[in-house]
Each structure stands twice: as structure tokens, then as C-alpha cells.
């Protein structure tokens, strides 16, 4: 494998010295870029784009051609695992993801297969290998998965949800069924992420998009417990390097201490957390990633720079910060505003690493 020309993202995750704060953006390969829209049109639909290694590679690399980003992230979807379990993923116009066969009973959970990442999810591994080859050591590649809780919400609700009443009914009325489902999902995620690492992912991230819908007690029992199991099961070394793992619970700022106890390397923060407070609480244990409100990219360039400066000052001197948005970039943000953001992070962060 090629040596990395820019490893500051990996170094920052391990709280090692860097020259400037590394930056990437969640959903950096996406609909805000006209070139992405053109490639997606060529693929026909979203899942066809994910399943074509060459096109998935192309959209992964597109933002790197525009911006001096410090990492690439695999172009895929968190719902690849439930799709590979046979739930029949499809996308409803204006509705988002849906499943033809959602989980409705204990028997459904018992019968769920654990997918082989090199078979049913082989298209993801092909994409990882293709991207690594084409990156040619420019920046590291991030692999990812959804968290067991977040995947379960889609599988039990049958798609996106606002109130999570169906899965919460299962959680309170049939907790054993939900625990069995989450356990199977954790095993599947471990296999899936380890396969991504073997295929060439140099860091991995677990997206717990809906953990913030839970009470503190339920978060620990139904979400964090299974992310902890994943962290314990991951291959943490490959190609002679540590493979850092980042956990991100959207709306999880009140649980950072418990999250840091899992043994992960870094925690993602959304914009509702104060990064100075987060560093005081857990900065001795983990790196922090975040945390500008993605909507700030609608602002004028001077305001974007001001916000970047404010977050950098909040984190303060030293290492262990990866700059990112607090969630995915919005699809109607002007691409040049993303460029202002990336450039500002590098330029304004240098004094913090002197």
C-alpha cells in the first residue's frame, strides 16, 4: 500500500501533533456538488451509484478535487446492512428510505441472517479497494457504518421516523426482541467494518444518528452498549498503523463521558455541544470532531470565517481536534461556501499548533 502523503486526519484522531487542524465534511460527496448530480444521473438511482465501484469512487473523489480536504469518506449508505439482510431497501421520492419487509415480530428477528461482507456487501468492499487505489496515498479513507440502534429504527419503523413510536413500543413492551436485533446488528457491523478495514479503510466511524431520541438510561442500554461491543470487536491495526474509530451520536452531547469510556479514539459532536466544554470533559481521553452548524454554510464568507475562528478558539491550543460540520452538509449550500470553510480551517488553525 502507498505511503500517506497527508496523515494529519489520522494523527489528530490519535491526539498527535499536526501542523494545522484537519478538516472534512460529513456528506462531502453529495448533492450540493453539480458534478455529483451528473454522476448520480448517469448511475440512474442512489443504490445503483453505491453498487457501482467506479462511480462510487468517482463521487468519493469529487470533493477532493475542489477542496483541500484531509480525508475521503467512502460513498455508501448506512442502510446497506439491513438491505443485505433481505429487508428490501428502496427510496420513495420525498419520503427517503423505506423497506419492503420491515421487522414486525420476534420471529422476524430470529430469522434475520448476518450478511457476509465479502458476499452480500461485496460491492462496498470493491468500492473501498477502488477508492484506495485511486487516492494513491493523497489522504486517508474513512469507512463507516450506522449504529445498531440507528439501523434498528429504520428496520422496525419501516423507514424514517420522527417520533420512533414503533421501535419504542418494541423497546418497552418486547425488550428481549429488540436486544436480540441489536446484538445481531452489532455482530454484522463488526464484520462489515473489519472487512472495510481489510479492504483499505484507514479509519472508521459509527453514525448513531438517532441515539438522541432516547433517555439517558435507554441510550446506555439500547445504543451505547452495542457501540461499545463494536469498538471491542474492531481490528484496530492495519498496514502497520492504528485504525482510529470515531463514535458520533447526534444529540448525544450529554453522554460524552460514557461514550469516551468505550475505548474509541474520537467522538463526533453536533452543533448543540460547546466544544470547549466537551474538551474539558473528555479531551484527556478522546479526540473531538466537529462541530459547526451545517446551516452556517448559507452565511456570507466573513460570517463562516468568524464561526470557524470561534470553534477553533473554543477547542484551544494543541492537538486532538478534527474540524467538521455538526451533521451532513445541506444539498443547496453554494459549493464555494464549502471552499471558504475548508480554507479558513487550515489558515486560522495554524497558530493553535505552533
Swiss-Prot record:
It comes from Pectobacterium carotovorum subsp. carotovorum (strain PC1). Pfam families: URO-D. One of its GO terms (molecular function) is uroporphyrinogen decarboxylase activity. This is Uroporphyrinogen decarboxylase. Its EC number is 4.1.1.37. Pathway: Porphyrin-containing compound metabolism; protoporphyrin-IX biosynthesis; coproporphyrinogen-III from 5-aminolevulinate: step 4/4. It catalyses: uroporphyrinogen III + 4 H(+) = coproporphyrinogen III + 4 CO2. The keyword Cytoplasm applies. InterPro entries: UROD/MetE-like_sf (IPR038071), Uroporphyrinogen_deCO2ase_HemE (IPR006361), Uroporphyrinogen_deCOase (IPR000257). The gene is hemE. The record marks 77 as: Transition state stabilizer. The lineage of its organism: Bacteria, Pseudomonadati, Pseudomonadota, Gammaproteobacteria, Enterobacterales. Keywords: Cytoplasm, Decarboxylase, Lyase, Porphyrin biosynthesis. Belongs to the uroporphyrinogen decarboxylase family. Its main location: cytoplasm. Substrate binds at residues 27-31, 77, 154, 209, 327. The keyword Cytoplasm applies. Signal peptide: none annotated. It is found in: Cytoplasm. One of its GO terms (cellular component) is cytosol. Catalyzes the decarboxylation of four acetate groups of uroporphyrinogen-III to yield coproporphyrinogen-III.
Amino acid at each position: 500500500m502507498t505511503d500517506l502523503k497527508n496523515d494529519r486526519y489520522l494523527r489528530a484522531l490519535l491526539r498527535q501533533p499536526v501542523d494545522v487542524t484537519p478538516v472534512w465534511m460529513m456528506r462531502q460527496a453529495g448533492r450540493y456538488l453539480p458534478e455529483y448530480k451528473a454522476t448520480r444521473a448517469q448511475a440512474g438511482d442512489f443504490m445503483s451509484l453505491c453498487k457501482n465501484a467506479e462511480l462510487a469512487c468517482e463521487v468519493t473523489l469529487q470533493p477532493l478535487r475542489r477542496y483541500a480536504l484531509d480525508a475521503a469518506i467512502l460513498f455508501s449508505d448506512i442502510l446497506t446492512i439491513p438491505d443485505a439482510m433481505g429487508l428490501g431497501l428502496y427510496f420513495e421520492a420525498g419520503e427517503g428510505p423505506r423497506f419492503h419487509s420491515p421487522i414486525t415480530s420476534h420471529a422476524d428477528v430470529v430469522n434475520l441472517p448476518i450478511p457476509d461482507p465479502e458476499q452480500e456487501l461485496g460491492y462496498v468492499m470493491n468500492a473501498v479497494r477502488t477508492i484506495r487505489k485511486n487516492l494513491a496515498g493523497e489522504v486517508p479513507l474513512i469507512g463507516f457504518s450506522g449504529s445498531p440502534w440507528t439501523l434498528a429504527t429504520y428496520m422496525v419503523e419501516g423507514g424514517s421516523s420522527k417520533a420512533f413510536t414503533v421501535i419504542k413500543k418494541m423497546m418497552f413492551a418486547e425488550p428481549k426482541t429488540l436486544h436480540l436485533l441489536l446484538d445481531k446488528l452489532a455482530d454484522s457491523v463488526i464484520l462489515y467494518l473489519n472487512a472495510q478495514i481489510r479492504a483499505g479503510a484507514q479509519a472508521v466511524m459509527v453514525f448513531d444518528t438517532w441515539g438522541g431520541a432516547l433517555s439517558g438510561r435507554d441510550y446506555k442500554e439500547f445504543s451505547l452498549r452495542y457501540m461499545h461491543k463494536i469498538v471491542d470487536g474492531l481490528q484496530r491495526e492495519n498496514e502497520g498503523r492504528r485504525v482510529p474509530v470515531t463514535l458520533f451520536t447526534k444529540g448525544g452531547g450529554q453522554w460524552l463521558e460514557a461514550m469516551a469510556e468505550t475505548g474509541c479514539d474520537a467522538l463526533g459532536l453536533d452543533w448543540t455541544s460547546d466544544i470547549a466544554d466537551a474538551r474539558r470533559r473528555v479531551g484527556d481521553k478522546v479526540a473531538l470532531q466537529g462541530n459547526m452548524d451545517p446551516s452556517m454554510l448559507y452565511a456570507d464568507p466573513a460570517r463562516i470565517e468568524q464561526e470557524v475562528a470561534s470553534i477553533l478558539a473554543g477547542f484551544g491550543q494543541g492537538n486532538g481536534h478534527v474540524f467538521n460540520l455538526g451533521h451532513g452538509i445541506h444539498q443547496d449550500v453554494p459549493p464555494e461556501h464549502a471552499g471558504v470553510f475548508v480554507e479558513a480551517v487550515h489558515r486560522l488553525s495554524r497558530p493553535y499548533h505552533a
